[in-house]
């Protein structure tokens, strides 16, 4: 699964959450430990695809924020502050890792914002799947590790037989 495919998967989820008219505020939230070149590419792929998919009268304001997670509870504090200051809440919140997803889930419940913010989580744990079942989180995106393993083996076999491997695995 590459950044293009991940971006398309996120776009598919976000497209159904856009306001019919007016501007939809979308925030991509990650931590310094999960922020990579790959997450940047996913963000730009979503931005590009949403621009082409939006309908007349729809506007999208896409932003990203990376929480410095070098100290304990930095992520929790940032998410809490965001929910306490309700004016800064986006319409759609896209979580780019499991820690952010679980913090946002807890804040939605703690600050009575369930239904006010649509949330796309990342990964699948019992907590996240339970939140989706309850309708607190809209959806989650997770990588299929079996598929990643198969692609890795294919890339390794190609490298061993040809001396190089393509970048599409």
Model feature map: region roles:
Residues 1-16, 29-32, 37, 134-146:
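Short beta-strand elements at the ligand-binding edges of bilobed clamshell
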